[in-house]
From Swiss-Prot:
Keyword Cell inner membrane: no
Domain of life (superkingdom): Eukaryota
One BP annotation, GO: post-translational protein targeting to endoplasmic reticulum membrane
GO cellular component, one term: cytosol
Protein name in UniProt: Ubiquitin-like protein 4A
Organism whose genome encodes this protein: Xenopus laevis (African clawed frog)
Family matches, as SMART domains: UBQ
UniProt keyword terms in alphabetical order: Cytoplasm, Nucleus, Transport
Amino acid sequence: MQLTVKALKGKEAHIQVSEGDTVLAVKRLVEEKLQVPVSQQRLLFRGKSLADEHCLSHYSIGPGSRLNLMVKDQVAPEGHSGNNTAWKSLSVILRKHFSPADAERVLEYVQKDYERSLSLLSLDDIERLATRILHPQYSEAADLGFLD
């Protein structure tokens, strides 16, 4: 089905999607068409903000629907843009080996799993990781201590 995505500043794009596509997949298509990074996009349908993980069918978005695009100001902490580069690189690699739809699904899964893994880290986990990175000589001794 075809959707129209209209940015508040006048740009407009027509994209081809299916009802089973996620909002995140739509955002990636919008990024290609309008050159607006996914991280800066906020899509609205009938005044309601759309969540990345939901399918278009969840919001009853059908053929010919019109989505509004709000562009957020670019505010990214240092080092965060490297994450975007990593996801783009992974996307390029996946598209070489899978169909575009399958590559998109795999990328979404990896991103969700990555975010989930990060959210499960405790402060103790982060402290142990930091110690191993900053003081590798101490972490080896600490690892041996757990074996006793």
